[in-house]
C-alpha cells in the first residue's frame, strides 16, 4: 500500500504558499468605512454602498457604535493593518466625506454636493450586471484630469491611488479585473465625479446570431428550417440586442479572458455598466494628522502669515502645557508609590515588634490581657458549642447553673469589643438566643443524672418530655 495523504514536501510547500498569501494580503491597503454622528438612513446606506466599492480589502461587517470615539477606531486599526478611514457625516446644512490616512495622516475633507445610491442607479438601467464574483477582487482605479493644478490636487491623486493595491500592467491577470472606479476632476468647478462600473469583455466581428449562440441561454430555433438562417440573417433577434461598439472600446487582448470567444490576440470590446454609487465631491480642506492638526489647505479661508504664526504659537503653548501636566502626573504617581512602600515597611516592622513582644511575655509568664479577662477564643467557641448541642438535643435553653462560665465571660467583655457572632452557618444550625431560665424545683440529683454535655442519659426522652424538636435551619 502506498503512503496515504500528502507527503512532507507537499505539506511544506502548501504551508509556504499560505504564508506568502497572508503576507501579500497584509501588504495591501485596508480600509474602514463608517459614519459619525446622526446621519440618517440614506447616509448610512451610502456608507454601505461605498463599503461595497472598497471590497474585498475592507471590513464588510464593521459596526461602530455611538460611544466609540475616533481614538478607539484608530487603536483597533493598528493591529488589524488598516491604512485608511472613509467617514461620512452630516450637519444641518451639508454632508461631508473624510478620507484619512493612518497612522499619521493627512486628512482630506470633502463636501458631498450630490449623491445617488446603488438602488437608484440600478433602477434607472434597463440591464444591469452585478454579481458576487465581481467583488472578489478590488476595482481598477482610473484617475482623469488630475494634472498640474496645484499641490492639493496632487495630494488628492496620491491619496486615491493609495486606497487600492498597485498593479503591474505587464503581469496583471485580466480575469481579476471585474470592476472599475473612475474619479474625474473638473478644474473649472473644482469638483470630483465618483463613478463605479462593472466591466464586461465580449468578442467582436461576429454576427448577432453567432453572439446568440455563444451565450449561455440557447436561442429558440423552432421556426427555422436550418441553422444557417440564424447565422446569415439573425432571424428571431430584436434590434435592441445589438450593442454599438467602436474604436473607443475595441482592443486586442494580450491574454485569454474568461468568457465565450475572448481568445488571446483577438479583437474584443470592453463594455462598462454603471452599478453605483455616484458622488460629486468638492475638496474643503487638508489637515495634518488624523482628524486634528494644522490646516495645510482650505478652499474658502485664506489666512495671513501673522495669523498662521499666532495659530502655531498657540498650538506650541498647548503642547507645552500638556507636557507639563504629564510630567506632574508622573511625579505624583512616583510619590504615591514611595509613600505606599514606606507605609508597607512601617507596618511590617510594627507587626514584627508585636510578635517579639508577645514572645517575651509568654517567656516571662505574664498573662496577656485577653487571658486575664477570660476571653480566650477557644474557650468561647467551646462554651458556645456546648450550649448549641444542648439546645439541639433537649429542645430548650439550659439553666443558668448548668453553664455558669458563659455568663461570666459575657460580663467580662469590654464595651468596645465585638460580640461573638450568634448565628452560625446554615449547616451547623443556630444558637439558642433565649436567656438562661431559673431552675424550677429541680433537685441536685436530677442535675447530676445528666450527661457530660448537658444532655440527659436517656437520650433526651425523660419523664414528661417528648421527642426533641428538629433543628431550625
Swiss-Prot record:
Q: Where is the composition biased (Basic and acidic residues)?
A: 335-360, 422-444
Which keywords does the record carry?
Acetylation, Nucleus, Phosphoprotein
| GO CC entries | nucleolus; preribosome, large subunit precursor
Q: Which residues carry this modification: Phosphoserine?
A: 238, 240
* Domain (Brix): residue spans on this chain: 29-292
Q: Which GO annotations describe the biological process of this protein?
A: ribosomal large subunit assembly; rRNA processing
- GO molecular function (one): rRNA binding
Q: Which residues carry this modification: N6-acetyllysine?
A: 438
Q: Where is the composition biased (Basic residues)?
A: 407-421, 464-473
Q: Which PROSITE patterns match?
A: BRIX
What does the record give as the function of this protein?
May have a role in cell growth.
What is this protein called in UniProt?
A: Suppressor of SWI4 1 homolog
Designated gene of the protein: PPAN
Amino acid at each position: 500500500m502506498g503512503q496515504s495523504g500528502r507527503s512532507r514536501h507537499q505539506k511544506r510547500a502548501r504551508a509556504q504558499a499560505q504564508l506568502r498569501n497572508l503576507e501579500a494580503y497584509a501588504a495591501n491597503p485596508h480600509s474602514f468605512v463608517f459614519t459619525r454622528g446622526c446621519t440618517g438612513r440614506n447616509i448610512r446606506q451610502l456608507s454601505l454602498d461605498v463599503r461595497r466599492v472598497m471590497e474585498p480589502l475592507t471590513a464588510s461587517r464593521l459596526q461602530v457604535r455611538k460611544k466609540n470615539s475616533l481614538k478607539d477606531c484608530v487603536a483597533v486599526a493598528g493591529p488589524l493593518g488598516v491604512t485608511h478611514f472613509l467617514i461620512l457625516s452630516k450637519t444641518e446644512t451639508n454632508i461631508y466625506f473624510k478620507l484619512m490616512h493612518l497612522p499619521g495622516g493627512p486628512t482630506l475633507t470633502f463636501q458631498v454636493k450630490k449623491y445617488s445610491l446603488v438602488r437608484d442607479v440600478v433602477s434607472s438601467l434597463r440591464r444591469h450586471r452585478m454579481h458576487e464574483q465581481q467583488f472578489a477582487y478590488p476595482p481598477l482605479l482610473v484617475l482623469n484630469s488630475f494634472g498640474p493644478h496645484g499641490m492639493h490636487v496632487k495630494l488628492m491623486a496620491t491619496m486615491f491611488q493609495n486606497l487600492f493595491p498597485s498593479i503591474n500592467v505587464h503581469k496583471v491577470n485580466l480575469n481579476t479585473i471585474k470592476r472599475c472606479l473612475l474619479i474625474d476632476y473638473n478644474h473649472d468647478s473644482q469638483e470630483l465625479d465618483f463613478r463605479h462600473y462593472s466591466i464586461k469583455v465580449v468578442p467582436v466581428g461576429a454576427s448577432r446570431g453567432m453572439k446568440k449562440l455563444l451565450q449561455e441561454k440557447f436561442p429558440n430555433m423552432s421556426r427555422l428550417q436550418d441553422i444557417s438562417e440564424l447565422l446569415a440573417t439573425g432571424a428571431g433577434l430584436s434590434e435592441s440586442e445589438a450593442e454599438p461598439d467602436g474604436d473607443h472600446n475595441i482592443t486586442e487582448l494580450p491574454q485569454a479572458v474568461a468568457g465565450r470567444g475572448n481568445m488571446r490576440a483577438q479583437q474584443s470590446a470592453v463594455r462598462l455598466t454603471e452599478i453605483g454609487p455616484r458622488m460629486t465631491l468638492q475638496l474643503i480642506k487638508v489637515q495634518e494628522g488624523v482628524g486634528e492638526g494644522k490646516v495645510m489647505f482650505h478652499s474658502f479661508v485664506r489666512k495671513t502669515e501673522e495669523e498662521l504664526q499666532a495659530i502655531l504659537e498657540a498650538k506650541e503653548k498647548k503642547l507645552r502645557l500638556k507636557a507639563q501636566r504629564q510630567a506632574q502626573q508622573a511625579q505624583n504617581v512616583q510619590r504615591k508609590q514611595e509613600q505606599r512602600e514606606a507605609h508597607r515597611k512601617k507596618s511590617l516592622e510594627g507587626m514584627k515588634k508585636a510578635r517579639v513582644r508577645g514572645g517575651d511575655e509568654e517567656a516571662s509568664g505574664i498573662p496577656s490581657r485577653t487571658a486575664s479577662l477570660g476571653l480566650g477564643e477557644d474557650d468561647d467557641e467551646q462554651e458556645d458549642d456546648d450550649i448549641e448541642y444542648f439546645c439541639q438535643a433537649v429542645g430548650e435553653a439550659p439553666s443558668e447553673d448548668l453553664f455558669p462560665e458563659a455568663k461570666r465571660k459575657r460580663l467580662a467583655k469590654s464595651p468596645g469589643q465585638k460580640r461573638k457572632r450568634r448565628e452560625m452557618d446554615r449547616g451547623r444550625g443556630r444558637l439558642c438566643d433565649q436567656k438562661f431560665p431559673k431552675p424550677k424545683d429541680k433537685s441536685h440529683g436530677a442535675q447530676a443524672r445528666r450527661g457530660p454535655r448537658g444532655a440527659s442519659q436517656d437520650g433526651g426522652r425523660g419523664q414528661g418530655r417528648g421527642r426533641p424538636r428538629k433543628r431550625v435551619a
